[in-house]
């Protein structure tokens, strides 16, 4: 049975609102881990959207695939999945499996090394594909989403394996921007599907 992620979470690098004219980074947590994974958070100095979750780091445990997006970071509401770094560089939300695979590489030399991350549709023919299904729980505060479907490709003895996260989404019924149905996310305004996710079938 899957164990839900607790709302407590860790912050690795935060762009904080500070007095200087450039962006300031602060390393707030040394190990960057929580009970069931890690969130990377960032603030945008001139962005009224507020706090956002940049990406989710998966540690490889099949029981840790429920991703509960916290409602707040401190007093700041988390209104976005993904966003922009610095002065406007796009930073879409994605699920990062590479840390888990990098750990495997350190243990077993036959696993090989990371070669690339890409959209699952770009995986080369003949590549073995391994799917992992995640459930993302969105709060009522999420207003904007910049998401990226992602595949991490490893080469082992000349053979490529693509690790592809897939998602089902459960959105809070009180969210005024989005709603979920059958694991997919839609805009309330016009009932169109939110793209950028690799939805589970």
Language-model segments: residues:
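Short amphipathic alpha-helical "recognition" segments used for binding
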Residues: 6-7, 37
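Bacterial N-terminal signal peptides
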Residues: 8-16
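Positively charged n-region of N-terminal signal peptides that target proteins for export
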Residues: 1-4
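Solvent-exposed loop and capping/linker segments of extracellular ligand-binding repeat ectodomains
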Residues: 20-201
């Amino acid at each position: 049975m899957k164990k839900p992620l607790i709302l407590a979470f860790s912050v690795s690098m935060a762009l904080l609102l500070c007095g200087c004219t450039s962006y300031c980074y602060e390393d707030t947590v040394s190990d960057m881990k929580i009970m069931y994974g890690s969130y990377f958070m960032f603030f945008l100095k001139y962005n009224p959207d507020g706090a956002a979750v940049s990406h989710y780091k998966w540690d490889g445990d099949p029981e840790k695939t429920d991703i509960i997006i916290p409602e707040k970071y401190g007093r700041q509401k988390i209104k976005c999945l993904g966003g922009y770094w610095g002065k406007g560089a796009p930073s879409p939300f994605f699920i990062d499996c590479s840390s888990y695979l990098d750990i495997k590489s350190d243990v077993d030399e036959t696993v090989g090394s990371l070669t690339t991350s890409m959209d699952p549709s770009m995986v080369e023919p003949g590549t073995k594909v391994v799917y992992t299904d995640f459930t993302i729980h969105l709060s009522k505060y999420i207003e904007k989403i910049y998401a990226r479907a992602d595949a991490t490709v490893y080469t082992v003895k000349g053979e490529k394996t693509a690790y592809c996260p897939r998602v089902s989404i459960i959105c809070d019924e009180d969210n005024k921007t989005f709603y979920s149905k059958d694991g997919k996310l839609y805009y309330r305004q016009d009932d169109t599907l939110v793209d950028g996710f690799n939805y589970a079938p």
